Design a protein with these regions (language model features):
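Acetyl-CoA-dependent GNAT
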Residues: 2-8, 15-94, 103-105, 109, ...
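Short glycine/proline-centered loop/turn elements that form peptide/ligand docking sites
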Residues: 103, 125-129, 146-151
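Short amphipathic helical patch at the helix-1/turn junction of helix-turn-helix
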Residues: 89, 123-124
Length: 169
């Protein structure tokens, strides 16, 4: 669990759990329920499976007992990369460092699982997200024409992750 100061509020980061299911589904709809993201919402059954899956990590940000953001990481057993599948921050919690803190927590989780890098895809028309990842040390590593359901291209980004220093006794 991590606490972070976001303006005048304290936000707590923790692993998602089954009891977060309703809040995660509501948050997903609040953030992504628009024509731009049509068909890309994570469903209730998918969230339920992901919360219980050993090959996924859901990290949530809570303020005042309510979820305000989440990040979903996926892990393949035969890959040295973790995949950031989704990140969502409620409108009222944006521009307070929550996304950057979630990203840092996800990177630590990836390293703890033995991964040496993280990958993600982002809509080519999402300039804010592209700038966020670039300023977080991610570099563009690929281009996927017509990747999204509305035929918008995706840009792939990746970042090498440093292993935590080994402790000497």
């Amino acid at each position: 669990m991590t606490r972070l100061q976001a303006g005048h509020a304290t936000v707590t980061l923790r692993r998602g759990r089954g009891s977060d299911l309703d809040a995660l589904v509501a948050l997903e709809r609040e953030i992504f329920d628009s024509a731009r993201f049509a068909g890309h919402l994570i469903s209730r059954p998918s969230f339920r499976r992901l919360l219980a899956s050993p090959s996924a990590t859901v990290i949530v940000a809570a303020h005042g007992g309510q979820l305000s953001a989440y990040m979903l990481m996926l892990y393949r057993s035969n890959s040295k990369f973790a995949r950031m599948y989704s990140i969502g921050v409620a409108p009222h919690a944006r521009r307070r460092g929550v996304a950057r803190t979630l990203l840092g927590a996800a990177e630590k989780d990836a390293v703890s699982r033995g991964r040496s890098g993280m990958r993600l895809e982002v809509r080519a028309d999402d300039r804010g997200a592209i700038a966020f990842y670039e300023t977080s040390g991610y570099r563009r590593s690929g281009h996927h024409p017509g990747y999204y359901r509305d035929r918008v291209d995706a840009l792939r980004f990746e970042k090498a992750l440093a292993k935590a220093p080994e402790r000497r006794s």
